[in-house]
């Protein structure tokens, strides 16, 4: 598993370190906000929003080499798509752990 793989993220930016730094800073700011939308969707028992928000984070995580977050997001996306909200709470909690770890790793990367 991987909290953050710089080589994957760099590959997706065409090896442009300036673009990578900009994207990482955006993720540090916007990722937790997007995670809040996932948690709100679960709290409101809105399966469609849960699926959509988890899907968005899955894509960002894949692009930035955050495999732990990608896998957790994918699992929640599938649960939302299937309307299995009672099972989604544990998945959303796993997403939160992965998000917090990713943001911490990016903070170290950007320091």
What are these regions (language model features)?
Residues 1-111:
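Two-component system phosphorelay core
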